[in-house]
């Protein structure tokens, strides 16, 4: 470990708006959804860049005036913009043919049914997101890696030699120019470590990071819920990768295996799966330990609620989420708890104590 880590107080609570944007009030415009979030006690919002009902990515990448207007709206409700997200566009950087139809709807209509044009559009979206993030004064950005190797995550039938390496080589080739654009704009690109993506655990992140030559803008969005569902130790993950974790989704989950199903879920709907996402506080994630570790390692980003639950309503989840995150944020100490007993010795005294003076 290099030097001494300085503890930081995590910012929050904030909320990811993707699951809440709707055609009905108060979720259909930026001012109304901002007021709603502020009234619930949130201090920040994370904005999905693909939903023109609340945000125009093209304008944000071309107009500082528009960005100032967005920030002004949020500030009028005592909110900050935490980050932008391109989860849907990032997914389209790499799509295996098996998922081509399923993911095609993530793109604008004019490039659908054309994988090459669709990917070019997605690349443009990511590059615009880098510029927009700079225009908005942000530090980090959330996305998905996309996937070429995911259909082969289970090694049956036996994978051809070199198949996975070829997939990751190609994935890195596609992302390197985008990472360079983020570097030019001073923004960390944070891949959410997520099932369905080639970057779905620590090892796959390392495989990708090596292929992009340890690019300093290649970082992680940490979401413990995805680790619960694959039975990965989400606390050890922080110990290993804390220097790459630049974003944090506060999302809960539970895993209750039985004699009938385990991590694969038996093709069941979310309600009947052994592993399922839950509203914050209703699952098994140890958020006290997570907030302690992240604070201790000096993470000073935002604690952003991502609500997903197959039982509880989003409105109730958002209401409870603000309070729960507030309860978990640690105001880190600036002094040692036993400073009152400091002996006041100096270097010479230390040498005498050790018998080396």
Predicted regions and their residues:
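Acidic (Asp/Glu)-rich catalytic clusters
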Residues: 5-9, 33-41, 61-85, 98-100, ...
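Acidic/histidine-rich catalytic cores of soluble enzymes
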Residues: 10-13, 28, 44, 51, ...
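A short, acidic, flexible beta-alpha connecting loop/helix-capping segment that sits on the rim
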Residues: 20-21, 304-314, 342
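The substrate-binding groove and active-site-proximal loops of carbohydrate-active enzymes
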Residues: 21, 56-60, 111-120, 165, ...
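Active-site acidic/histidine proton-transfer and metal-coordination neighborhood
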Residues: 27, 31, 36, 76, ...
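Conserved, mostly hydrophobic/aromatic
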Residues: 37, 45, 74, 84, ...
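Glycine-rich, proline-tolerant flexible connector loops at the mouths of alpha/beta enzymes
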Residues: 47-70, 90, 145-152
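C-terminal helical cap(s) of enzyme catalytic domains, especially alpha/beta-barrels
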Residues: 314-337, 341
């Amino acid at each position: 470990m290099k030097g001494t880590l300085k503890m930081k107080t995590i910012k929050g609570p904030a909320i990811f708006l993707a699951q809440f944007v709707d055609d009905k009030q108060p979720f259909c415009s930026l001012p109304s959804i901002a007021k709603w979030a502020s009234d619930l006690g949130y201090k920040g919002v994370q904005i999905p860049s693909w939903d023109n009902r609340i945000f125009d990515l093209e304008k944000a990448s071309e107009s500082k005036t528009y960005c100032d207007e967005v920030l002004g709206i949020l500030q009028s409700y005592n909110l900050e913009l935490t980050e932008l997200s391109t989860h849907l566009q990032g997914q389209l950087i790499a799509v295996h043919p098996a998922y081509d139809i399923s993911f095609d709807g993530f793109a604008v209509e004019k490039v659908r049914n054309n994988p090459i044009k669709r990917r070019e559009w997605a690349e443009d979206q990511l590059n615009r997101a880098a510029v927009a993030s700079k225009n908005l004064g942000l530090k980090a950005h959330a996305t998905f890696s996309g996937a070429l190797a995911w259909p082969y995550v289970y090694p049956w039938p036996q994978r051809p030699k070199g198949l996975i390496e070829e997939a990751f080589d190609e994935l890195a080739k596609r992302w390197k120019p985008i990472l360079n654009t983020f570097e030019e704009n001073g923004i960390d690109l944070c891949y959410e470590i997520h099932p369905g993506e080639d970057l779905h655990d620590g090892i796959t992140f390392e495989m990708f990071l090596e292929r992009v030559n340890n690019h300093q803008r290649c970082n992680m969005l940490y979401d413990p819920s995805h680790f619960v569902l694959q039975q990965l130790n989400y606390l050890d993950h922080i110990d290993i990768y804390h220097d790459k974790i630049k974003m944090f989704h506060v999302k809960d989950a539970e895993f209750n295996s039985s004699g009938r199903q385990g991590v694969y879920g038996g093709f069941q709907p979310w309600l009947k799966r052994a592993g399922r996402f839950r509203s914050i506080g209703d699952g098994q994630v140890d958020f006290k330990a997570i907030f302690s570790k992240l604070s201790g390692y000096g993470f000073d980003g935002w604690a952003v609620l991502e609500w997903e639950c197959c039982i509880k309503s989003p409105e109730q989840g958002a209401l409870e989420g603000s309070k729960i995150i507030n309860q978990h944020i640690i105001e880190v100490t600036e002094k040692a708890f036993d400073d009152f007993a400091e002996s006041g010795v100096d270097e010479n005294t230390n040498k005498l104590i050790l018998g080396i003076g």
